[in-house]
């Protein structure tokens, strides 16, 4: 960690506790700042708040008194708190500096940064980059929106390590000096408009990722969205990824991932399924090549990386049949992606909490579905859907029973896909629990040698 002195004896107000606020407050205190934490929720019984108070950090909770701004503090804002909250709105009017916890991670570390943002795919890209580093002798520490507080991880990395940071649009607002060596924008679609108010504001938040980059840095982005992503502020060397055509960067041609005319890997050897994941893979591969990760480590990762837990996660193969856990697919859009990810015959496990909706919008994506095993409150609806399309339908009591019933109908090379298109709460406390039950049952049917 750098001995950063820019906040010594400065008044700093951390607005919003949670994990990032807690770690930011501790770091700021360590850097010599006079720290106050404010949260609109009552924190009188909160363990983290009590821990901060034991360090001499003032905690004000239950409301946002504007008197906290009277000593003109620097604001460190939790990314989840919108600028419309009274104390932040007033701080803007007073011209106070407002930073994010991610900005702190940059100020205290000399480690080069690979920063990943985008509407879709950023968690997959970040995780895949982390896995490629893990397969090499280099160190890439995951941080940010992926679940590891950036300012905490930044204190632990060496200058020779990489910080691999997933950034939401919320975290990118408030960037002042933050400068990744390699920035990735996976894509930009309409999202979070309740926070950003309009699409232009959302797009501009994403573009903050490259505003401090120089000609020595890299921006990796989707070639087919370059008009949306690029702006006059862009100074970094821009490289593209495309699954459709040759570009200055990385692309797919004749079934191979290609960089600078060199074939990296046949796409048939990739474990991570889905057309949408090809773009994620290209972005991750290009970033790791630029960071010096050996091609062998990249290939090792691509032939073993099975995705994020419960997101079209490759679970394993039993004989000739691959099993995929997509328990996080709690709506029809997510299941559309899943069903569209395979060319082989699919045995589709679906059903769950009944929220009153129908599922006819899935019909165009059911071409490769050979059979359906339905469960949960919506099993009658899914049975009706399957029968209307001439699919073989079996009813099951729950996910575990569904996996058992699969064994009676499975044929060579069938893909077994759990993609419920429904929330789990009718039978399971979380989608994670539902996914774990699927995995447990899959393992129970593996042959013992």
From Swiss-Prot:
<keyword id="KW-0067">ATP-binding</keyword>
<comment type="pathway">
    <text>Cell wall biogenesis; peptidoglycan biosynthesis.</text>
</comment>
<keyword id="KW-0961">Cell wall biogenesis/degradation</keyword>
<keyword id="KW-0131">Cell cycle</keyword>
<dbReference type="GO" id="GO:0005524">
    <property type="term" value="F:ATP binding"/>
</dbReference>
<dbReference type="GO" id="GO:0009252">
    <property type="term" value="P:peptidoglycan biosynthetic process"/>
</dbReference>
<keyword id="KW-0133">Cell shape</keyword>
<dbReference type="InterPro" id="IPR013221">
    <property type="entry name" value="Mur_ligase_cen"/>
</dbReference>
<dbReference type="InterPro" id="IPR036565">
    <property type="entry name" value="Mur-like_cat_sf"/>
</dbReference>
<comment type="similarity">
    <text>Belongs to the MurCDEF family.</text>
</comment>
<feature type="binding site">
    <location>
        <begin position="118"/>
        <end position="124"/>
    </location>
    <ligand>
        <name>ATP</name>
    </ligand>
</feature>
<protein>
    <recommendedName>
        <fullName>UDP-N-acetylmuramoylalanine--D-glutamate ligase</fullName>
        <ecNumber>6.3.2.9</ecNumber>
    </recommendedName>
</protein>
<keyword id="KW-0573">Peptidoglycan synthesis</keyword>
<dbReference type="GO" id="GO:0005737">
    <property type="term" value="C:cytoplasm"/>
</dbReference>
<dbReference type="GO" id="GO:0071555">
    <property type="term" value="P:cell wall organization"/>
</dbReference>
<keyword id="KW-0547">Nucleotide-binding</keyword>
<dbReference type="InterPro" id="IPR036615">
    <property type="entry name" value="Mur_ligase_C_dom_sf"/>
</dbReference>
<keyword id="KW-0963">Cytoplasm</keyword>
<dbReference type="Pfam" id="PF21799">
    <property type="entry name" value="MurD-like_N"/>
</dbReference>
<keyword id="KW-0132">Cell division</keyword>
<dbReference type="InterPro" id="IPR004101">
    <property type="entry name" value="Mur_ligase_C"/>
</dbReference>
<dbReference type="GO" id="GO:0008764">
    <property type="term" value="F:UDP-N-acetylmuramoylalanine-D-glutamate ligase activity"/>
</dbReference>
<keyword id="KW-0436">Ligase</keyword>
<dbReference type="GO" id="GO:0008360">
    <property type="term" value="P:regulation of cell shape"/>
</dbReference>
<dbReference type="Pfam" id="PF08245">
    <property type="entry name" value="Mur_ligase_M"/>
</dbReference>
<dbReference type="Pfam" id="PF02875">
    <property type="entry name" value="Mur_ligase_C"/>
</dbReference>
<comment type="function">
    <text>Cell wall formation. Catalyzes the addition of glutamate to the nucleotide precursor UDP-N-acetylmuramoyl-L-alanine (UMA).</text>
</comment>
<dbReference type="GO" id="GO:0051301">
    <property type="term" value="P:cell division"/>
</dbReference>
<dbReference type="InterPro" id="IPR005762">
    <property type="entry name" value="MurD"/>
</dbReference>
